[in-house]
Amino acid sequence: MRILLSTFLWRLCSQGSRLALLCLGAAVVACGGGGADGQAPDPVAPAPATPSNPPGGAPGNGTYGNLSAAALGVGASLNGALPFPASNAWNTNISTQPVDPNSDALIAGIGLDRGLHPDFGAGLYQGQPIGIPYVVVAGTQARVAVQFTDYASESDPGPYPFPHNAPIEGGPASSGDRHVIVIDRDNNRLYETGNSYPQPDGSWRASGGAVFHLDSNNVRPTAQPRWTSADAAGLPIFPGLVRYDEASLGPGGIRHALRFT
């Protein structure tokens, strides 16, 4: 992996067919990709208890923007699939791109003497499960109502295909961000919520939610400028996570940008 000190975060454009690239500071990319959230104690999702087979073929092979071959379940393998088209900013190798002219100022604004802290791991941290979990569901997954308590005006309305036992970041008793991430593999849709609580009637309550189109560069067609999302920055969470199925391939297995905070 290369560390580019003047790399980027992305913010969604409204009604557009592209992403606006905002140079905001230091980010990490692999030669062809990478992915994780670096804010403690929110590292990437741990490996499944019974890992599915990693995607076939050599690292570098893969299917972009079509997740129909993904396995089902919590922490399931995508079997070589990647969210969004190959031309998407999340999947673009920027290792040969010129450094932004404002690189030094951006780095100084973040903190020149501050490093990056990787939060990889599995198991428990202070009694709570480590990582940001996700679950892959089929297109037949029942859709349920989601009540948004804080950012309804900036959320994509339900229903969402959320299983009642969908994994919650930090576990059911967590007092943290409580993200829920669900991938509908058959419809190529990503559903993300924050401060998520299952309700007795099968519905969910969350502070806000976003639906991303994994088969398009118009990743969130409903979004307006400055809208938030489950990560509070207008970005999807899932595309930047490091997953077991890709990391297990070794060098070259991660082919997307890394997420960190």
Predicted segment positions?
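N-terminal secretory signal peptides that target proteins for export/translocation
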Residues: 1-15
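Bacterial Sec-dependent N-terminal signal peptides
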Residues: 24-53
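Polar/charged alpha-helical tracts
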Residues: 7, 11, 45, 105-109
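Intrinsically disordered, low-complexity regions enriched for glutamine and histidine
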Residues: 13-16, 37, 162
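Intrinsically disordered, low-complexity regions enriched in Ser/Pro/Gly/Gln/His and often acidic
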Residues: 2-3, 24, 83
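Short, surface-exposed polybasic-aromatic patches that bind anionic ligands, especially phosphate groups
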Residues: 48-261
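Gram-negative bacterial Sec-dependent N-terminal signal peptides
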Residues: 9, 16-29
